[in-house]
Amino acid sequence: MNIKFNLIIIILFILFISNVNCKKIKNKKHLTPQRLRRFVEHSKPISLNKKVWKITEIENIFSAQIELTFGIRQRNIVELEDFVWRVSDPNDSLYGSYKTFEEIKEWVKPLDESIDAVKNWLIENDINEFTVTKSGDFIRTIVSIDKAEELLSVRYNKMVHKLSKQSFFRSLDPYTIPRELYDHIDFIGGVNHLPLLSPRPKESSGSAGGGGGGKVNGIGYELESLRNNKQIKSFNDKKVAARNGDPYLSPDLIRKEMNVSQTSTNSTHLGNSQAIAQFLKEYFSPSDLKIFQYRFGLEPSQVDNIIGPNQNLNPGIETALDIQYIMAMAPDVPTWIVSTGGLHEGQEPFLDWLVDLSSNPKLPLVHSISYGDDESSIGLAYTDRVDTEFKKYAAMGRTIVFSSGDFGVGCNDDCDSFSPGWPASSRFVLAVGGVIKKKDGSIIGDEISGGGFSNYFSRPWYQVDECSSYIEWLNGSLSSFYNQSGRGFPDISSFSENVVILYKDKLMPIGGTSASAPIIAGLLSLINDQRLQKNQSPIGLFNPLLYKIARDHPNSFLDIDFGENNYKCCTNGFKSKSGWDPVTGLGLPNFDELVKYCLE
């Protein structure tokens, strides 16, 4: 009797376990036992900050569409990185000996069998409409949500950003691909990774104007006054200041603070160029740019090229800031706007930007981007592939400038570790932090200035001494909050509060490292111009030269030794100190000194 009873219990237990496992499999759509044998997971589930994002159902998975981007595995990536380090090292005999677009394209182009394997897989799954980029490194297609779920064994949701109300279709599930494709695909965009959202330029807290900053200290700057009043060639910090007494910053005052002489801004080389990147319907207003230039006594100049969509009558604050200040710093340098992606739930604008650049043989020399996210919200496969794209740009002598972010060190919900930002944490971009000019004339690190040490990327050789010195200075404090062997950022800083732009016919003081990045990018364009005039190469990946100059000629920087980036992160943050620190980097550039050593 006992034997029969025990046997029944065992059988019931086996049936129960089998039922549980079947339910687990069914919970992952289309993932049958046969598929498990033939397919392999190619991504890891990402963490979603539920304080920032709301998860909802997609109303109709058959009509809703998603754009999938397949990053095809490229060749010679190790050799590419070695080459980048050599052409970026001022002590190397190959310094500045960049490759052309076509040379890079042929060097790293995926194998034909990799491209064909992915194309055949799509066709086998009744996906016959897709495009392959000129360089062969990306394949893109638009499919229904239902088809994407079937293809990748995932379940999509609608993710709504609680602050901006922007929504995107994404999955929290790791996707699967056929085992035989594992070595042909780096990542698939449009599945897990949420689009990068800008650390939006905010109206500076000291503004006396409402709803767009139309007033400064009671002085109204409406369109009518712009027509009737004389130019404002510079703001006088004694007469025009925010409520807290800190001065508003005009292009002229910013140049003075960074020692940019008038002769330095005279750009003449036709081979020079610069660009800003804009996503999420951040459009450009030629009218705002024209009035901004007139109002501040700047030389009139126009945008030379707009890649992608633009709606003149629907401008964005981010675009106004970026274009007005990159051109204010480098007024005669040919300037592009690369505009990608609207607000469609199925798009990934940052990835669109990368794909567009990877197919363009006439890339501008300097790019300014004011968008980012936490490293922890992004998969390693995605960041590694994006890093490869940055390496390709560096190998061609291009400079990529990112704002370091507007949330200080960032932190997790438990306040027991910092959350570094990305792409600012990449070793192959120049990350720009923020500083504030105070009413007493001092300049300090901005508490919002994104900075810290990467959890993904190891420390590059060009900043080992600087980061090690800072960590030694910490003397063990905060050691559990950050990765002591990670890439340190930012690299350099500029002004991030009370920077005045013109938006929808009104002058408006704004804040954020979104202001810092285009200011620095414009100055790098000036350096490129002077190098090109002397038949020297463009600066490319500037970081190795920048850190070398800081060691050999520290007078090229205004060292910022006060400030802490503990913005909204409990009570912890990094502090500024003499030398490099993860609040302001190497400090504020002393431009006329810096450019001298860039020409040696």
From Swiss-Prot:
Q: Coiled-coil intervals in this record?
A: none
PTM: Activated by autocatalytic proteolytical processing upon acidification. N-glycosylation is required for processing and activity.
* Enzyme active site: 318, 322, 514
> Where would you find this protein in the cell?
Secreted
Record-linked Gene3D superfamilies: Peptidase S8/S53 domain
Query: Which Enzyme Commission number(s) are listed?
Result: 3.4.14.9
User: Cofactor comment in the record?
Assistant: Binds 1 Ca(2+) ion per subunit.
| Residue ranges the record assigns to the propeptide | 23-220
Q: Domain Peptidase S53, which positions?
A: 248-600
What GO biological process terms are annotated to this protein in UniProt? asexual reproduction; macropinocytosis; phagocytosis; proteolysis; response to chloroquine; sorocarp development
Task: Enumerate the glycosylated residues.
Answer: 91, 259, 266, 475, 483
EC category: hydrolase
Q: Signal sequence span per UniProt? A: 1-22
Instruction: Give me the Gene Ontology terms describing cellular component.
Output: extracellular region; lysosome
**Binding-site positions, Ca(2+):** 559-560, 579, 581
Reaction equation(s) it catalyzes: Release of an N-terminal tripeptide from a polypeptide, but also has endopeptidase activity
Query: What keywords are annotated for this sequence in UniProt?
Result: Autocatalytic cleavage, Calcium, Disulfide bond, Glycoprotein, Hydrolase, Metal-binding, Protease, Secreted, Serine protease, Signal, Zymogen
- Chief place of localization: secreted
Disulfide bridges in this chain? 411-570
> What does this protein's UniProt record list under function?
Serine protease with tripeptidyl-peptidase I activity.
Q: How does it assemble?
A: Monomer.
The protein depicted here goes by the name: Tripeptidyl-peptidase 1
Name its species. Answer: Dictyostelium discoideum
